[in-house]
């Protein structure tokens, strides 16, 4: 039920849009061509530091592809041909109309195409690459291509018509791209093109001021829109209403920092990928608004700490929750390592070497945002393993952060409808390094699609596509649509105990009359990760239930001996010989998506048990020199115990487990 304030807000919004549609915003006839405010760093101050680098070579390579209308998008290459049809889904051959933007059914992929792929191209982030290539090489062809594409876009996307005006966030992304194009190549544009660019930037600002997603999507959508509106007001102070934009948008960004970022630094979407988006947005805003509060900066710092903890030593980040394949500034390269550029930028902003990143990450973002000073900061040197840590607000624990990287997520679901969350409460992911080279042991299979295929959308964000337990074939919450969960479970952290040698996490997930308790125990000295699940029903429940454990493997899963499976080259998982186990790739559950729109078969181990509750299941992952040939699971008076042979056992009671190892 919408409140009176929301109804009034939306009414004013639509009246304003309708009036603006009839009379498109225009600049005064005498409005002169204005320079961009000198806030962003002058590229000439650091371009010499990029000369001859792998990064510079890659920019030229990307620019060549873009000039040939071969666009790297979301892990694939879209070839548009000579004419770029900006409203076209090139994969499906569908092009939507030029109706008034509110009449575009962009969620209906059969009529509009997959809006995600259409919008990704229309963010115009590839034009930033062309502008960067121009500054690095001074080759005029890159500016010429920018001008041709801008004029083409303006012709095919008139004010408030068509799918590319249907999302305020996409308008914001495009505005930010054009800001960077103007900053890097504005003086090289023909005067008529640049005057038109200023007009279109002004129109984007008018649109954003009126269409902020205050009620529609008060998450990273609203944040991104406000950051872009503030940037327009700050970098173009001579535009009409620029002062209003700066003041209003800065207030929204401050409010969203307070609302969206928890005290432990985690973002409330419960998605690692969207955490990077949010941190980049807050950081860019802080660069343009040095008056942000100490509290604002403190939360940004904690966001960086959280991101650093989620990132393994080689810079890879697990995809917890949705990943949409994009990036605020440079959506190219290995998406799992996008966080490295963010951490490099945070180190430059906070003048610290607190976080680890690859030195090459500086060129991707920090250099362009903060200038040559970004190159003087040094990432944290490799050293002793970081201590296990718990982010209580997120419900995320990093049990090991060294050559073995283990992340457990007890909560799974984010704020409100949890639109970018997956049903993966009590799940775990794991990576391991051998001779310094990391390999995935347990993975999160990713996202695959948002609206392109509803059935696959439900699968990839469902419980069975994560390393947790499913009961009676049902997800932990009810699917309320592609961006909504209903009846989310209650999750509680029961115990967290950690030290140099071990980490123990116990948590409960309650839903549909089911209580699932999972305990994780990492024994660093032995390189063993023990996981025990106890599933209980409601009082008086005497019906049989199907309980399934899913283990999505990063490498091939091969039976090594009864009850033991080898995962890849350097890990094993052991479970009771009596367990009913199935291992397969593809089919219903065995898939991984490394980029939106792409999926491939991937091994999954499924353990099934049917019977009256309670049910106790346990596994032990061997990630070091110690091996586990077999295990037995005992559950006396509700106290699970894993027995791994004579004088080797783990008893899980209240508090930290009791370990016997002789």
Q: Where are the language model's segments positioned?
A:
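Aromatic-lined, polymer-binding surfaces characteristic
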Residues: 97-98, 104-108, 112-301, 310-311, ...
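Short, flexible loop/turn elements at secondary-structure junctions
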Residues: 90, 401-403, 412, 469, ...
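Carbohydrate-active enzyme catalytic cores, enriched for enzymes
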Residues: 266, 270-441, 497, 610-617, ...
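CBM-like, beta-strand-rich accessory domains located in the C-terminal region of large
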Residues: 172, 323-324, 331-334, 348-360, ...
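Catalytic Cys-His active-site segments of thiol-dependent hydrolases/isopeptidases
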Residues: 442-446
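Extended, charge-enriched "interface" segments that sit outside catalytic cores
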Residues: 16-109, 116-121
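Boundary detector for helix-to-coil junctions that initiate low-complexity/charged tails
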Residues: 1-11
